[in-house]
């Protein structure tokens, strides 16, 4: 399925005061980044914002369901992304408010991940001046 270009443009326009929105295509949708931090996915013409333990109650209070995927074998998997409230599609302030929460969740998630093991560095080059 193609990415909803109109929705993508709206997100970029609405969030311009907060930073630059970029994307990475994935399985018929796109992962969205705000200044390099994952904050949402676009899937089937809808925006799903990143959530976490700290923000789940806010999403629940708005009635924003959790993103789920049903596999061919019938298994269902959920991810901690929440359907955007209806006002994010036409009110820049609403888009900004919910995107800020999602970016904060993205930053907390990134901080919790273990850092990758670094590769052993090469021996210093004695001919290279610093």
Model-derived features with residue positions:
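Charge-dense, helix-prone N-terminal extensions
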Residues: 1-130
């Amino acid at each position: 399925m193609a990415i909803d270009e109109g929705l993508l443009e709206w997100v970029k326009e609405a969030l311009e005061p907060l930073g630059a929105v970029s994307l990475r295509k994935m399985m018929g949708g796109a992962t969205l980044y705000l200044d390099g931090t994952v904050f949402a996915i676009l899937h089937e013409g809808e925006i799903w914002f990143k959530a976490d333990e700290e923000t789940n109650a806010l999403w629940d209070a708005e009635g924003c369901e959790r993103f789920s995927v049903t596999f061919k074998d019938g298994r269902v998997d959920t991810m901690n992304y929440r359907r955007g409230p209806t006002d994010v599609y036409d009110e820049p302030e609403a888009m900004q408010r919910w995107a800020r929460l999602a970016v904060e969740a993205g930053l907390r998630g990134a901080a919790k991940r273990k850092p990758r093991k670094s590769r052993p560095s090469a021996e210093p080059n004695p001919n290279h001046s610093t």
